[in-house]
Structures are given as structure tokens and as C-alpha cells.
A protein has these predicted regions:
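Non-heme Fe(II)/2-oxoglutarate
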Residues: 1-72
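A short glycine-rich, His/Asp/Glu-containing loop-to-beta-strand
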Residues: 67-86
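Short beta-strand segments enriched in hydrophobic/aromatic residues
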Residues: 81-83, 108, 157
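Conserved metal-binding segment of the jelly-roll/cupin
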Residues: 84, 123-140
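A short beta-strand-loop-beta hairpin characteristic of the jelly-roll/cupin
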Residues: 87-92, 99-101, 107-126
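Short beta-strand His + acidic residue motifs that chelate non-heme Fe in jelly-roll/DSBH
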Residues: 92-94, 138-146
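A short hydrophobic beta-strand segment most commonly corresponding to one strand
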Residues: 104-106, 147-158
Length: 158
């Protein structure tokens, strides 16, 4: 059900992906919620693909990740950036799509934030690790306390 692969992308290629996404000129956009309108969290987001369209000039940067997943059809590709907090706490269980597809989370940097599934399984945020699971499996990210930011690439696909 949940599959985990470490060093998912060739390490030399991953260095470039990380450098681009975590670079000071990468366009992140403030989002006043994390899970749903009115929650107490915020994050910065970047849509690479949404509503059947490539929405970012940076799509080519993450294309090798998409190719390696053997995607037949994309639903959404989004980068999430959260900032350091004073204690680790979950954001809230949720699903990313209102229908059954696949979800993959690629961790762009290592930090002490985790992904928790409704099954109780916990996945550490370690760079270049990917976790793949059915989109109807509820999950939550958490805050982190050790790095300035936590960055993940969230991919929903068939």
C-alpha cells in the first residue's frame, strides 16, 4: 500500500532539482491555510501542474521525477514550503484528491518533520526520498523545528 524509495532521483540530478526549488529566486506563493480554509496554519506553494495545464516554467526541473514515476496522466503537481516552528505538531489528516488516484511525496530537504498516515505509519523527511500511496489514504504532514524550511513535492497522478 505505502511504498518508500530512498535516493529516488539520480543524486547528481537531485542536486540540481534541490538547488532550483530551494534557490532564492524560486517563486513561492503565500497560502493562508495548509489543509482547508480557516485552519491555523499557512504555507508557501508553487503549482507546477494544475487543471490539465503546466503552470510553471520550472516544470522542466521536476520532469525527471514525473518520468521516473511512469505517470500516465497528471492530476496536480505542487511544491509545499513550510517554515520552522517551536514544536512538532500535525496539520490534520486529509486526502489530496476527491477521487482515487495515486499520490507521491518527494522530500526536497531533510528535516525533523514527518508524514503520518491514518494507519499510524510515520515517514521521516529525508531528501530525495519518495513515498507513494493511494490517494484515498488519509495523511498529514507536521511542522518541523530544526531547519528554516521543509520543502516537499506533492504529485497526484494516474
Amino acid at each position: 500500500m505505502i511504498k518508500i524509495k530512498e535516493n529516488f532521483v539520480d543524486p547528481f540530478l537531485f542536486v540540481d532539482i534541490k538547488k532550483q526549488i530551494m534557490g532564492k529566486y524560486f517563486p513561492w506563493f503565500y497560502n493562508d491555510c495548509k489543509i482547508e480554509e480557516g485552519d491555523e496554519h499557512f504555507q508557501f506553494i508553487h503549482f507546477f501542474y494544475k487543471d490539465n495545464l503546466v503552470t510553471s516554467d520550472y516544470f522542466k526541473v521536476i520532469k525527471p521525477v514525473i518520468d521516473k514515476l511512469n505517470v500516465k496522466s497528471l492530476v496536480r503537481v505542487k511544491g509545499n514550503l513550510t517554515t520552522k516552528d517551536i514544536k512538532i505538531k500535525p496539520f490534520g489528516l486529509h486526502t489530496d484528491a476527491p477521487f482515487k488516484c495515486k499520490t507521491a511525496i518527494l522530500y526536497i530537504n531533510t528535516n525533523n518533520g514527518i508524514t503520518i498516515f491514518e494507519t499510524g505509519e510515520e515517514i521521516k523527511s529525508e531528501e530525495n526520498k519518495i513515498v507513494m500511496y493511494p490517494s484515498n489514504l488519509k495523511h498529514t504532514g507536521t511542522t518541523h523545528t530544526d531547519e528554516k524550511v521543509r520543502v516537499v513535492l506533492n504529485i497526484n497522478y494516474f
